[in-house]
Amino acid sequence: KKNTKKDFPQDSHEQLWGAISAVFQSWQNQRAKTYRRLNNIPEEWGTAVNIQSMVFGNMGNDCATGVAFTRNPSTGENSFYGEYLINAQGEDVVAGIRTPRNITKKERLESSSEDLSLEETMPEAFAELTKIYKKLETHYRDMQDIEFTIENKKLWMLQTRSGKRTAKASIKIAVDMVSEKLITKDEALLRIDPKILDTLLHPTLDPKAKKNIIAKGLPASPGAATGKVTFNADDAEQMKANNQNTILVRVETSPEDIHGMHAAVGILTCRGGMTSHAAVVARGMGRPCVSGAGVIKIDYAAKLFKVDNAEVKEGDIITIDGSTGEVMLGEVKTINPDISGDFSEMMKWADEVRTLKIRANAETPLDSRTARGFGAEGIGLCRTEHMFFDEERILYVRQMILSKTKEDRLKALDKILPFQRKDFVEIFTIMKGLPVTVRLLDPPLHEFLPKTEKEIDIVAKSLKIHSSEIKNRINYLHEENPMLGHRGCRLAISFPEIYEMQCRAIFEALYELQKQKVEAVIPEIMIPLVATEREIEILRELVDRIAQEIQKKNNFKVDYLVGTMIELPRAALNANNIAKHADFFSFGTNDLTQTTLGISRDDSGKFLDDYVENKIFKIDPFVSIDQDGVGELIKLACSRGLEAKKNIKLGICGEHGGDPDSIDFCHRAGLHYVSCSPYRVPIARLSAAQASIRAKK
């Protein structure tokens, strides 16, 4: 009455239609919109309403209600798993109002609980439930999430559905079901959401690290997380926007907290079980979660929680381990995961099916090792400018930029050459036998110059010049729109000696490896920001000239490719002419998206959400390829490039290279490889396999 200004209806039909209407209206509430956005669910789908007669689990001690999974949703273990409450209604189990009991005796003993399991208190109902869950899983050929009620000792099944599970459990269940001949390998591959693999590829707590454990709850969602304590979902979202990791601490979570749960790196609740809202949502999101930590007493008004004599305030750092249920004060050291077993088996199946090659974007030895460890088949983007920012070499780079004559520039470049050569030797050694795409210098020169007065004075003193010279050079190099300014191949047209030095470093590194009898890589030298045929023609001649010079001088031969990034619409439209001088195209989808849509990636955050909400874009085009615009240019460039050169190699190296939907597009567009960040390589491998399977259907 307070909300509707009407008395509660007494007519049962009016009540029923009111409930049905409420479900339909819930599709447009804020938490539903957030959930759709996070899970890429189309708004036009709508929601269904199920109507069924009621049974009661709260009529006495011979009644109960529960939630069960046909396999463990956290580990994937093939054992019946769940929770129940005596004399309670269904929502009580998941709402976290009371801490529920285990369903099986085995679970109870493992958790050291004194509360008897369903198997012990109601053995007949448990036996019937066991038969039914096995039948349901065999029928649906997937792990089931079951809700049931026991009314006066009689078992009623309320619903069954495919259960949410952790990434680890998803893979184990899929691999086990193939072994059990319930599903095929292709079905197993299609069942894994590639994005959830992220949760398997990040650190866990170092078992040797010192831990100040202040509480222990239920291990609701695996993984470890460290962050600042916050008690409010909105604050968690704001802190994430400020690049702060947070642990969202709540008595219990509800659907209103979903945006904060997504923003937080971990979730801690003091009420609720393994099937509570916090546990289920955290598992689905891949967030570590500890639930049911009853010793924690939260004071929302004072913005703190107490455990015995300890007091933890908002902003204090804690660590949670969702695999053990431990809550610790401060930051605890982590270790990288060991990827093997079921994960390796699944990746092996994916590699057998996919046709797209998977490379990584890497420019340091550490990145290269990580990429190779995750199964990368080469480097699709090695950004050479990142090598310039090292403390040892940035001074020489600045000296080169500040030089007034070509002679002075060459002297500075001679000092940079050994550093670049050393970097390439390391990377080529790690990636031996695989292709490595080296992008020659791309950013505008002003990015390498000092920014503050203090930095300017330090550089001036080091180079023995007046600070005014540096300021004058900074002013001269300043650009209103540097993304479209004097960068990429345009720099090399003005200052060819920069690309000459980089090419020398590449070919001298190859000679070093040949002397050491290291298996050769095939370098793919990539020229960025090409818009015209003449640009690539001039710079191809430069690369070939340096290659011949180094090979002749050292009496050795090496295979190499020269290609370009397609990141401007004009380049895509003129791909047939550009292909005459290129061995490969690599689509730089970050800049191609910016230049096609006329949208700055750095500034788009202010309005892109409005565009998605108003259905102008289905999804952020910097996250997933805009297939109707950017995608059409890519397909056109591929077609025209192949017309001019049948064996031209085609790939992408933008951020989209790790996005499953973009990878599916790349497969359909006929690209040969995608390149992504090292930690997204397994995601790309699985996504490419799924694209291949879908294409066969």
Ranges and model annotations:
Residues 59-123, 160-188, 263-298, 310, ...:
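Extended active-site and interfacial segments that coordinate phosphate-rich ligands
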Residues 51-54, 65, 70-71, 79-87, ...:
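Generic beta-strand/beta-sheet core signal
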Residues 1-75, 87, 98-104, 108-132, ...:
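Extended, highly charged
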Residues 339-341, 349-697:
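Conserved alpha/beta-domain cores
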Residues 6-13, 40-41, 57, 75, ...:
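Hydrophobic alpha-helical scaffolding
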Residues 31-68, 233-235, 242, 247, ...:
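Flexible, glycine/threonine-enriched loop-and-boundary segments that flank and lead into catalytic domains
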